[in-house]
């Protein structure tokens, strides 16, 4: 299978490309920089979609970059990096003489409203209560194709755990020093997924023709709280993890609106993901963290 991957040079993209190549697929990246087996976004816009059997978009500016202030300029960057790349791929797919058979977009569980009681599956409502839920709604709308000639899949990802990037890379130093702990109250749900399972779900969605619609890209461990995650990460490192990070500090670093992503959470279940027949490699948090910090 020839697969076109937008944003394929990041943490998730690198893992996906490795898995697809290991399974015998050909991969072309769409990125800002030219290179072997790559096209640029400018080339995609001017020349259209290269011949491919499937397309995946992973592109998007890191929202939780602590070095960037949460102001209008950065919010626009966060929006544009997702909407413009998604819209460009969707447009070139719809205009292609021979469109790909499959189109996969990775968004986020921020679509669902944070709650200490509600449980969300792929059919649950959401998408209209704050900046991030509205972002996911616009993002998924930008990727929607007319008609049904191309099979469409949306994977709403949780926090991605794995070696060499993602959430773990930002947390390791304080936890290794024994200074880690829950964020805020620690009671908020923490929807997570191991990198191997997220890219596994993407590969499964590419290869299994019966898969379509929205899938929740989270582990089947929906009751994990932030405090439980912190305790498990400390245990994986052999370090204590009981020093909480106060809400006020999180809000000071990330801004009040962006801090919601860390101080609040959702109980998300992968009901449809499991129903597709996908089998998780890391369904348990302890095993996922042991691998991620190895």
Task: List each model region and its residues.
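N-terminal Rossmann NAD(P)H-binding glycine-rich loop of SDR-like oxidoreductase domains
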Residues: 3-23
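Conserved Rossmann-fold NAD(P)-dependent oxidoreductase catalytic core, especially the SDR/UDP-sugar
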Residues: 87-129
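NAD(P)-dependent short-chain dehydrogenase/reductase
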Residues: 130, 147, 154, 158-189, ...
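NAD(P)H-binding glycine-rich loop region in Rossmannoid oxidoreductase-like domains
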Residues: 35-88
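Active-site Tyr-X1-5-Lys
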Residues: 128-152
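Alpha-helical substrate-binding/gating segment
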Residues: 172-180, 188-223
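C-terminal amphipathic/interface module of NAD(P)-dependent oxidoreductases
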Residues: 260-294
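Mid/C-terminal beta-alpha module of Rossmann-like enzyme folds, strongest
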Residues: 2, 208-256, 290-294
């Amino acid at each position: 299978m020839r697969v076109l991957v937008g944003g394929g040079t990041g943490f998730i993209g690198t893992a996906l490309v490795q898995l697809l190549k290991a399974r015998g697929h050909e991969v072309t990246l769409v990125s800002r920089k030219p290179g072997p087996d790559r096209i640029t976004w400018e080339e995609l816009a001017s020349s259209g979609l290269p011949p491919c059997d499937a397309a995946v978009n992973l592109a998007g500016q890191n929202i939780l970059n602590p070095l960037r202030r949460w102001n209008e300029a950065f919010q626009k960057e966060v929006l544009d990096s997702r909407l413009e790349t998604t819209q460009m791929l969707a447009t070139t797919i719809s205009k292609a003489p021979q469109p790909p058979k499959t189109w996969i977009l990775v968004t986020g569980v921020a679509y669902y409203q944070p709650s200490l009681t509600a449980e969300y599956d792929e059919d649950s409502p959401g998408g209209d209560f704050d900046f991030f839920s509205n972002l996911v709604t616009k993002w998924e709308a930008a990727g929607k194709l007319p008609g049904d000639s191309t099979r469409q899949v949306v994977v709403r990802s949780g926090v991605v755990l794995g070696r060499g990037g993602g959430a773990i890379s930002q947390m390791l130093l304080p936890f290794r020093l024994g200074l880690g702990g829950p964020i805020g109250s620690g009671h908020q749900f923490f929807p997570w997924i191991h990198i191997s399972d997220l890219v596994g779900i993407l590969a499964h969605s590419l290869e299994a023709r019966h898969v379509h619609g929205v899938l929740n890209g989270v582990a089947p461990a929906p009751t994990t709280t932030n405090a439980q995650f912190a305790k498990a990460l400390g245990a994986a490192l052999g370090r204590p993890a009981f020093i909480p990070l106060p809400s006020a500090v999180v809000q000071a670093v990330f801004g009040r609106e962006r801090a919601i992503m860390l101080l609040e959470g959702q109980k998300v279940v992968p009901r449809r993901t499991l129903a597709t027949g996908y089998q998780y490699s890391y369904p348990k948090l302890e095993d996922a963290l042991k691998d991620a910090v190895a």
